[in-house]
């Protein structure tokens, strides 16, 4: 066991865990942040996606000890009080969820995409989201939701504010 220190969703956490434990295990089992889902356990499906220093990463294959000094954002860290993050709201508006299992990973990947590319083409969206699998087949709605946020950024001039 080791004492691990984290910055998650803007808050400091200390956890006693095996350094080889995955970030996903720390989030779900030690910190009760269950919005991040376990899918495949191999980094292939995207259900466990979180942001580490603003980049989409698979938490099921990320060792907790490797991210101690980095900024981690989970799905729980996106909304501000009762106000959903623009990507969360767009997913809701466009019906880009069914069973909901992949939704948090999809949203986290979409946030990472829009933070680095404020106006992605449909092809860029499809390419970036390729690592996120949806068993229910909501891909066209996911693309529409991401395009909606990108288009609203153009209208409102909030491109730099999408991550928060």
Describe the role of every protein-language-model region.
Residues 1-164:
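Signature of N-terminal electron-transfer/Fe-S-associated modules in redox systems
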